[in-house]
Structure formats: C-alpha cells, structure tokens
Regions:
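N-terminal basic, low-complexity leaders that serve as flexible interaction/assembly modules and, when applicable
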Residues: 1-93
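Active-site-proximal, glycine-rich beta->alpha crossover segments in alpha/beta enzymes
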Residues: 90-180
Length: 180
C-alpha cells in the first residue's frame, strides 16, 4: 500500500461514496506478526498492555506507520468490559480468554454490574484521546457479540462446541437471558 493513500478512503466508502482505492486496514490480530509489535509488547497479558495507554496507542499506530493503511484498529480485546467490571477473566497466551470462575449460577449475576467507562476503563478512554490527537486516518474499534463474550464467561475458556453454553440456554433460559 502506498504511503500516499488517501486518509479519507475509508470514510468515503463508509458513507457510500466512491474512493480512489479500496480502503485497507490491519486487524489487531494481524499486528502480532509485526516485529515492532513483538519488540514493544513484552511479557504479561494483553490486558496488561491494553491498560497502558501510551503502549496501546503505539501498538495501534504500528500498522499505520508501516503500511500506510486507511484506518487504524484500536489495540484492545473483547473481554475488556467483563474484566473491567471485575469478572476475573484474562487472555492466556496460546489459549485465549480464560475465566477464573465461570458464570454458571444466579449468584454469578451479582459478579456483573453495568460498565462505567470513565471509572472502569479510563485507560481505554486515554488511549482513544491520544490516538485522536495523533491519527490522520479513522480509528476503528470492535466489540464482542453478546453470545461470544457470554460463551467465554459460561464456558470459562474458548470452546468449539459450546456445550455448557447450550445447556444453559436450554435448561436455564432465564439465567442465559439475564446474562445477555
């Protein structure tokens, strides 16, 4: 991709207008292959890195600087909200999201509370502020679908078959719906 690519190509296409080229961006997961990512990421969990605004901003900027992509993707993870409200979930290297105590009972509802972004995730807000001041391309963010995040909480780890989740949906639909 050319370093002269239009910073508005993504916004042009997003608003239904033609652009001089198809916009390109680099998902966070792909960023793991960048040598500069491996150099700055260091040890510790991804959540540790996300909680450091300068580091998270720098990682977000890496594909933009290297490839001149048309949008940046916020360095984050779909479990940040559950972790931020104290659920006890982390991202284990080579495994993915792992819950300390999976969500299985009505009592587990007490472990969840509404997210207050300013109180619970000030590091995300600060990262976004930094990026808004530095980026010349749009900033994209992502979120996990309720089923995906809910399944991580219920299963306690990544699952291909979601048996515990399906059992809860079938046997305890009120509990499942409350989680959703």
């Amino acid at each position: 991709m050319s370093a002269t690519s239009s910073p508005t190509a993504f916004l042009q296409v997003a608003t239904g207008k033609p652009a001089e080229h198809t916009p390109v961006w680099f998902m966070r997961q792909a960023g793991r292959s960048l040598p500069e990512y491996r150099a700055v990421r260091g040890e510790g969990s991804i959540l540790d890195a996300i909680k450091q605004p300068r580091l998270a901003a720098d990682i977000t900027l890496q594909p933009v600087a290297r490839y001149g992509v048309d949008a940046a993707v916020l360095y984050s993870d779909i479990v940040v909200p559950a972790h931020a409200v104290g659920f006890g979930i982390d991202v284990a290297p080579g495994t993915g999201p792992v819950a300390e105590h999976p969500f299985r009972t009505v009592a587990d509802l007490q472990r969840l509370r509404p997210l207050d972004p300013e109180a619970d995730t000030p590091y995300v807000l600060e990262t976004v502020r930094m990026l808004a001041a530095e980026l010349k391309v749009p900033l994209l963010a992502f979120a996990g679908a309720p089923f995906t995040v809910g399944s991580y909480l219920v299963e306690g780890k990544p699952s291909r078959d979601h048996l515990i989740t399906k059992q809860m949906m079938r046997d305890e639909p009120e509990l499942w719906n409350a989680l959703m």
